[in-house]
Regions:
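Catalytic loop of short-chain dehydrogenase/reductase
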Residues: 2-18, 41-123, 134, 145
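Conserved residues in the N-terminal Rossmann fold of short-chain dehydrogenase/reductase
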Residues: 22
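C-terminal helical subdomain
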Residues: 30, 132-140, 144-182
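Hydrophobic positions on the long internal alpha-helix
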Residues: 31-35, 39, 113-114, 161
Length: 182
């Protein structure tokens, strides 16, 4: 992930968007799809997303499209990533309702597909708990000297989701060891 933030700090253009989506959206999606069949009943999957992916930065139309895609299927979420990439290529991402932030859009996509996969696993009766979370702003190389949490503090929410009793909740977004608005 530190590689991705380094890319994002290089500016904002089609190349930055492509590399960011490849890492955060498509990379995480592919890893999730490969690992999911290996997870036994009662297992858990936790995707580390970000509060940067919250939907409050989008037009109502795009926000609703994300919410609908998260209830539909992975191709619907992937189509939103393509729509963002196309809008950036045309220089119209803000007119199209997206923020001018590749990292934020990639993390919104990651949270959305995590919700879809959780919904699908639940329909299949797999007995899995699948959630996305934000570790917070952690003092790592990725934060380039910033960050307010230690790595141990940043790990608290993902570890909680992986190991502790979360009341059977799946398909949610979490931050600071609690369910959070997406």
């Amino acid at each position: 992930m530190s590689r991705e933030l380094g890319i994002a700090l290089q500016g904002f253009d089609t190349n930055v968007v492509k590399k960011t989506l490849e890492t955060n959206y498509f990379g995480t999606l592919e890893a999730t799809q490969e690992l999911l069949p290996l997870i036994r009943r009662g297992g858990r999957l936790v995707n580390v997303s970000s509060a940067a992916g919250r939907l409050n930065k989008y037009s109502e139309e795009i926000r609703n499209a994300f919410l609908q895609a998260a209830k539909t299927d992975v191709p619907a979420v992937t189509a939103l990533m393509a729509k963002f990439q196309d809008a950036v290529t045309e220089g119209s991402e803000q007119r199209a309702g997206f923020p001018r932030a590749a990292y934020a859009v990639s993390k919104a996509g990651e949270t959305a597909f995590t919700k879809v996969i959780a919904m699908e696993a639940e329909k299949e009766g797999r007995g899995l708990l699948i959630n996305a979370c934000c570790p917070g702003y952690v003092k790592t190389d990725m934060a380039r000297g910033g960050g307010v949490k230690t790595p141990d503090e940043g790990a608290q929410t993902p570890v909680m989701l992986a190991l502790q009793d979360i009341g059977g909740k799946t398909g949610r977004f979490w931050q600071s060891e609690a369910e959070a608005d997406w």
